[in-house]
From Swiss-Prot:
Transmembrane segments: none
EC number of this enzyme: 7.1.1.-
Lineage: Bacteria, Pseudomonadati, Pseudomonadota, Alphaproteobacteria, Rhodobacterales
Gene: nuoI
Membrane topology: Peripheral membrane protein
Record field: catalytic activity: a quinone + NADH + 5 H(+)(in) = a quinol + NAD(+) + 4 H(+)(out)
Organism: Dinoroseobacter shibae (strain DSM 16493 / NCIMB 14021 / DFL 12)
Binding sites annotated in the UniProt record for [4Fe-4S] cluster 2: 75, 104, 107, 110
Function text: NDH-1 shuttles electrons from NADH, via FMN and iron-sulfur (Fe-S) centers, to quinones in the respiratory chain. The immediate electron acceptor for the enzyme in this species is believed to be ubiquinone. Couples the redox reaction to proton translocation (for every two electrons transferred, four hydrogen ions are translocated across the cytoplasmic membrane), and thus conserves the redox energy in a proton gradient.
Enzyme class: translocase
Residues annotated as domain 4Fe-4S ferredoxin-type: 55-85, 95-124
A GO term from the CC aspect: plasma membrane
Record-given protein name: NADH-quinone oxidoreductase subunit I
Record keywords: 4Fe-4S, Cell inner membrane, Cell membrane, Iron, Iron-sulfur, Membrane, Metal-binding, NAD, Quinone, Repeat, Translocase, Ubiquinone
UniProt record similarity statement: Belongs to the complex I 23 kDa subunit family.
Length: 164
């Protein structure tokens, strides 16, 4: 019993715990840093990353959305509102496609439900706004997002194709 007390006292007076912690700190001090200097450096994004919403167009310029309203029905947050009208050729197209980004939970159900890959969640995660009204996306804003991110969205969908 007395031997154990001497060992504890020796460790205490020789600052054993202090030097053990100092050694651990030095070990990690010389390793490469794991943090990034955001916004100057950005980490890689997965092809499955779900960011800002976008509506896509076909290569001929026609919008892909066929107004089936599956995305509106499956949205658990009820963030999507769609109005549609039939066209002269018998097909339907949306007249109103709104997403309330303040309600959206970025679950990706809308993207999974869409039979024509019209609504997608793009790679953009930096869409801070100054007013709440800017977070209500209408059809034009969504189509603009789709045009801006089309190359990256198409690449991500192609990379994700084996898993769908």
């Amino acid at each position: 019993m007395a031997q154990m007390d001497y060992t504890r006292a020796a460790k205490y007076f020789l600052l054993f715990d202090f030097f053990a912690g100092f050694k651990l700190g030095l070990k990690y001090f010389f390793k490469p840093k794991a943090t990034l200097a955001y916004p100057h450096e950005k980490g890689p994004l997965s092809p499955r990353f779900r960011g800002e919403h976008a509506l896509r167009r076909y290569p001929n310029g026609e919008e892909r959305c066929i107004a089936c309203k599956l995305c509106e029905a499956i949205c658990p947050a009820q963030a999507i509102t769609i109005d549609a009208e039939p066209r002269d050729d018998g097909s339907r197209r949306t007249t109103r496609y709104d997403i309330d980004m303040t309600k959206c939970i970025y679950c990706g159900f809308c993207q999974e439900a869409c039979p024509v890959d019209a609504i997608v969640e793009g790679p953009n995660f930096e869409f801070a706004t100054e007013t709440r009204e800017e977070l209500f996306y209408d059809k034009e804003k969504l189509l603009d997002n789709g045009e801006r991110w089309e190359a990256e969205i198409a690449r991500n969908l192609e990379l994700d194709a084996p898993y769908r």
